[in-house]
């Protein structure tokens, strides 16, 4: 029998994702970077090209900064979130709407997080638009 997840950890993981969304919205790259493990990677599945592009954290942050430079707003709005905890690991599925100026794109984030030194950090993020 699998033990029930710690409800406190569930809220911490949800809080980490909420902070991610907030930092992305206000272009706070220091706070965004702090949410990720230094060796984290970000994978973007290109539906039209049927390929996966993997970016370093620095490359991902560069993409976010370029969107903020190009548009008055660049915001990922979380919609439905599903969290699964397995001891010190978490998996999060987040449906979102990404707003860039007048444009809106819908997609899904898949996050993997690990509990390190008393906090949850993102170790991998995959997404498609």
Please tell me what each predicted stretch does.
Residues 1-38, 54, 58:
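Short, low-complexity N-terminal intrinsically disordered segments enriched in polar/charged residues
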Residues 33, 43-45, 123:
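Short, hydrophobic secondary-structure boundary micro-motifs
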Residues 41-46, 51-103:
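Surface-exposed, charged secondary-structure patches
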Residues 91, 106-129:
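Short beta-strand edge/turn micro-motifs at domain boundaries
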């Amino acid at each position: 029998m699998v033990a029930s997840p710690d409800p406190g950890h569930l809220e911490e993981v949800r809080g980490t994702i909420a902070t991610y969304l907030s930092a992305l919205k206000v272009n706070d790259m220091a706070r965004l970077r702090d949410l990720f493990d230094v060796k984290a990677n970000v994978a973007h599945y290109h539906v039209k090209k049927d390929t996966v592009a993997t970016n370093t954290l620095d490359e991902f942050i560069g993409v976010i900064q370029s969107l903020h430079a190009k548009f008055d707003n660049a915001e990922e709005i979380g919609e439905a979130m599903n969290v699964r905890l397995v001891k010190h690991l978490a998996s999060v599925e987040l449906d979102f709407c990404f707003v860039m100026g007048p444009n809106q794109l819908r997609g899904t984030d898949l996050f993997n997080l690990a509990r390190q030194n008393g906090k949850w950090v993102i170790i991998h993020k995959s997404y498609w638009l």
